[in-house]
Amino acid sequence: YTYRLPLFRMLKDAGVNFDFVGSRQQGLKGDFEWPRIDGEPFDTDHEGVYGIRTAKALARLPEAMKKWDETPDIAIIHLGTNDLKSPETFHEDVIVPQRDIVGLLRRGNPEVVVLLSHLHWPSGPAGNLRERVEALAAGLDSDLSPVRTVSYQDGFETKPGTDLLDGAHPGPSGSEKMARAYFEAMQPWLPEE
């Protein structure tokens, strides 16, 4: 499952002209056949990597960006889940790499809008990380290249078999809730019909 599929549908339903960007096209199961949305093939381009830590995502991004057909106008960054076991090093492991990822995106497009996603859990280590991500967004935000945080935790069930399949990865309902939050967050920057 991926939030990108319902986000694709929401953008199509809203009449938005868009193109997902990324060097990757496969999900966790490489042979999975994505459904068509209203007769159109799902745009599978993305830069998500299952199980990746934030610093590793930063390290692979410069090479990945060379494969992109376009530079993004809006970027969703959902990182940090795989760093939660080391809360004492959140700054070095999550915040600094996310800051540097925003810098790389801005080199590609100085006007990129960045949406920094909070993680699924509202408390515990993810809750502690939340404050740091808010501070990062506030420090990076500019008129030319806005940086906003996105939260979808209200009403999001984190027990296995609910919005999260296994307590960590979103299933269909969790993906839908994430997509809705991202779709609403990007509204001010979506192109007019």
Cite the ranges covered by each PLM segment.
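Catalytic His-Asp segment of secreted/periplasmic serine-dependent ester chemistry enzymes
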Residues: 120-193
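Active-site segments of SGNH/GDSL-like serine hydrolases
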Residues: 76-85, 101-130, 153
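Conserved SGNH/GDSL esterase-like catalytic core that processes O-acyl groups on lipids
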Residues: 1-92, 96, 125-131
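N-terminal cationic-hydrophobic initiation segments that often serve targeting/anchoring roles
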Residues: 12, 65, 102-107, 137-141
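Surface-exposed acidic, glycine-flexible loop patches that form ligand/cofactor-binding
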Residues: 57-72, 103-109, 187-192
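Residue-level recognition of beta-strand->loop/alpha-helix junctions
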Residues: 22-24, 118, 151
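Short, well-ordered alpha-helices that flank and scaffold nucleotide-derived cofactor binding pockets
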Residues: 5, 9-13, 107, 135, ...
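Loop/turn elements at helix/coil->beta-strand transitions in domains of secreted/extracellular proteins
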Residues: 14-19, 70-76, 109-115, 142-148, ...
